[in-house]
Amino acid sequence: CIRDRLERVLAAGGDAAKTVFSGVGKRRDEIERALEAGIRCFNVESFAELELIEQVAGAHGTSAPVSLRVNPDVDARTHPYISTGLKENKFGISIDDALLAYQRAAEAEHIDVLGIDCHIGSQLTEIAPFVDALERVLALADRLAEKGIVLKHLDMGGGLGIRYRDEEPPQPAEHAAALARHLQGRDLEILIEPGRAIAGNAGILLTEVLFLKHHEHRNFAVVDAAMNDLMRPSLYSAWQEIIPLKQRQDESSDTAASVKSYDVVGPVCETGDFLGKDRDLALEQGDILAVRSSGAYGFSMSSNYNTRPRAAEIMVDGDVATVVRERETLLKLMQGEHILPV
């Protein structure tokens, strides 16, 4: 629910006037709440949505600030599940239809056209797709200006990737410089929406080795975290580094655990429940493992699958550790559930 995300922003002290409202499925009540809160703008993703926003704003005797999310048909060169800027994706208004959409928005009595939005995907590791999308969007902005529709801002979304394994994504400064070269001389406020690039490598998932299973063809390290805690490996076949907190240096001694290739798996009853495969690790039962780069799309994608309460979250600031999200209890998990009356 998009409205719920807005409410969390406001509850955390966020400013609605600095908040853009994206999403392909905005409901009427969500639009009403966003207008009431005074959001910066709606990123409109379809003609039908534009019509609904106009109706809602008119019913409330106000104008809705909008930016149209344009789909530039650019290959982000990322996992297909998180590619959002191709014409076959569900996001945005096709760049071929965008001129008509802007004309309708400009003619609408209760719509205030502010800008243009473009977000082509997540975990991009190259500059070229960003630049390609920017060039197409700027060409559209020029055509709009010729029609008398002058935009105030350009929102390039997010998508800047991070290093999980051996990727070499551009640094934020490189990303900014590449965009700036194409924006010189333009009177546009530039918005960006970094998420993974800020949070991704700031978080780790800690998990304990419950058992080691040695089979003829494969070794398993069964841990107490699972796909419900960290969905990315199962959903995207994503690779995240797994490091034992206890490093064993003398692996040749009789008492040391030898290095073996392990699949690190959880307790959930699915073969797809894994955090990593074919990892060369020296492990013993009871070891604590750190799954790195879990700060983005970790807890937010977690679930209660297999009746598993979600993990606690700890924020570390210098030498101060604070519980910022308590471990979910079974009672909370079952809250709101009811048995049919006899």
Mark where each language-model region is.
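Charged (often Lys/Glu-rich) extended helix/loop segments that serve as interaction or gating elements
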Residues: 178, 187-342
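Structured helix-beta-strand junction loops
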Residues: 38, 185-186
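Glycine-rich beta-alpha junction loops
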Residues: 70-74, 120-124, 158-162, 196-198, ...
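Conserved N-terminal phosphate-binding loop of PLP-dependent enzymes in the Aspartate aminotransferase
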Residues: 171
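Active-site-proximal beta-alpha core segment in soluble small-molecule metabolic enzymes
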Residues: 3-153, 162, 167, 178
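Hard-cation-handling environments
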Residues: 182
